[in-house]
């Protein structure tokens, strides 16, 4: 990103980055060793960059990318057994929308809501409505997969503590 793009990007997201609530995500693990804060920042920057290049709404891409995982409880710490459709991958986008409106109502609109709500496609059946939503969805997948450096890391990516099927019998 150019210096002018970095300055512009920061102006768009500074209120989120300075928020005490968003800062807590520095302590939440995402996948592998990356935190939710670092993951969300990487997704946001990548979606912003792509949106600028494609002459799309880069502000919505930056904000939606930053808030797409704005949930309260690190999913790895929740040991509660839940039906499949109530697990983190299916519900955290709705929680992120609610939290985003609660903490950043002045930044939210229907486009950003849709970006956040639909970023888990195809896990969630309804795709993003806007190009910017697709950019955040794809950036999220790319950034998430970058943590997988070896095949066994794939199991930790999905929250499995042990790799039973890989252990010697």
Predicted regions mapped to residue ranges:
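Metal-dependent phosphohydrolase cores
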Residues: 1-169
